[in-house]
Amino acid sequence: MNYQMITTDDALASLCEAVRAFPAIALDTEFVRTRTYYPQLGLIQLFDGEHLALIDPLGITDWSPLKAILRDPSITKFLHAGSEDLEVFLNVFGELPQPLIDTQILAAFCGRPMSWGFASMVEEYSGVTLDKSESRTDWLARPLTERQCEYAAADVWYLLPITAKLMVETEASGWLPAALDECRLMQMRRQEVVAPEDAWRDITNAWQLRTRQLACLQLLADWRLRKARERDLAVNFVVREEHLWSVARYMPGSLGELDSLGLSGSEIRFHGKTLLALVEKAQTLPEDALPQPMLNLMDMPGYRKAFKAIKSLITDVSETHKISAELLASRRQINQLLNWHWKLKPQNNLPELISGWRGELMAEALHNLLQEYPQ
């Protein structure tokens, strides 16, 4: 593999000009995310069939040539298991590569495992066993070693030739339109951003709290998410989730009480007064400003029967259409559908099981089934 290390704006512009002559590119990123809220970009890998490039973001100030490539509709971008890479692109460039196809999704429609790893795919299609020893390396450290660079370059060097085979295979299976729809769904999921005022809904065991405690949790979770984004710090490095829940549950009135709830010294030192102020604010809210009690999906009287009935329907659809039941519906998607049906959580879009390619296969049957399970 003869790769080119791109470390300057001029080199990036020259590379992108050359890439424009090709109809498809393989992309990958290397990043670090240990304590930060946002992934920290360490490297971008690109291969168009002729130019194999490692783009070092630490030396680039003008990203406009690459952004133009990413949004060029005449160049298809291929990634493998690219959901986290998409988050990197959104964070760095404010947009996603378009059009985009994920080879892990293509492979799933061709009967491969749902989470088929890149190394397994390369071994099957190319007969090459990849060295994955650098997968946990520090991609922000400089200089990068030759071994690191070769590891990174291999991710796109082997990916691009495989894409053509997978596209043919998926099209022959008759599932290519559905696979492309699933790629669009992956992008849509990645672009969903939690509003701080809704962050409390994602706190484990929030449903166990009463209304004023929920109001307190709403204030605490809103503050924590804003602080995490502002400081680029993972939310649990601001205040741990279980500690946030405990503060909402017991609504302490002193730093000593925070300590007795098990909060760490640093949590109390840096945020103790803020937490107490938010508790006090929740204490003074009028009754009509309190949120409605949360209902736990799994405690709904018909949940187990409804879940089992949906699973049975999915098995039937899977066998009829000769497609993996695991690909057709996950536990998360079934729960999303039931949350929507029983109006337990606000949702901006139709549940995934009754929209897109899945909806074409089973929306009508699911709607009929759900009528048997009113709230």
Swiss-Prot record:
InterPro entries on file: 3'-5'_exonuclease_dom (IPR002562), HRDC-like_sf (IPR010997), HRDC_dom (IPR002121), HRDC_dom_sf (IPR044876), RNase_D (IPR006292), RNase_D-like (IPR051086), RNAseD_HRDC_C (IPR048579), RNaseH-like_sf (IPR012337)
* Annotated GO biological process: tRNA 3'-end processing
Mind listing the GO molecular function terms for this protein?
A: 3'-5'-RNA exonuclease activity; nucleic acid binding; nucleotide binding; ribonuclease D activity
Q: Could you tell me which Pfam families the record lists for this protein?
A: DNA_pol_A_exo1, HRDC, RNAseD_HRDC_C
Task: Please name the SMART domains in this protein's record.
Answer: 35EXOc (SM00474), HRDC (SM00341)
Identify which top EC class this enzyme belongs to: hydrolase
Q: Does the keyword Chaperone apply?
A: no
**The protein's required cofactors:** a divalent metal cation
Q: Which GO terms describe its cellular component?
A: cytoplasm
Question: In the Enzyme Commission scheme, what number(s) does this protein have?
Answer: 3.1.13.5
Which key words are in the record? Answer: Cytoplasm, Exonuclease, Hydrolase, Nuclease, tRNA processing
Q: Which reaction does it catalyse?
A: Exonucleolytic cleavage that removes extra residues from the 3'-terminus of tRNA to produce 5'-mononucleotides
Q: Where in the cell is it found?
A: Cytoplasm
Q: What is the superkingdom listed in this entry's lineage?
A: Bacteria
Please indicate if the UniProt record lists tRNA processing as a keyword: yes
- Locate the HRDC domain: which residues? 210-289
Q: What NCBIfam families is this protein classified in?
A: PRK10829.1 (NF008089), rnd (TIGR01388)
Tell me which family the UniProt entry assigns to this protein: Belongs to the RNase D family.
General function of this protein: Exonuclease involved in the 3' processing of various precursor tRNAs. Initiates hydrolysis at the 3'-terminus of an RNA molecule and releases 5'-mononucleotides.
Protein name per the record: Ribonuclease D
Q: Which organism is it from?
A: Escherichia coli (strain K12)
High-level lineage: Bacteria, Pseudomonadati, Pseudomonadota, Gammaproteobacteria, Enterobacterales
User: Which gene underlies this protein?
Assistant: rnd
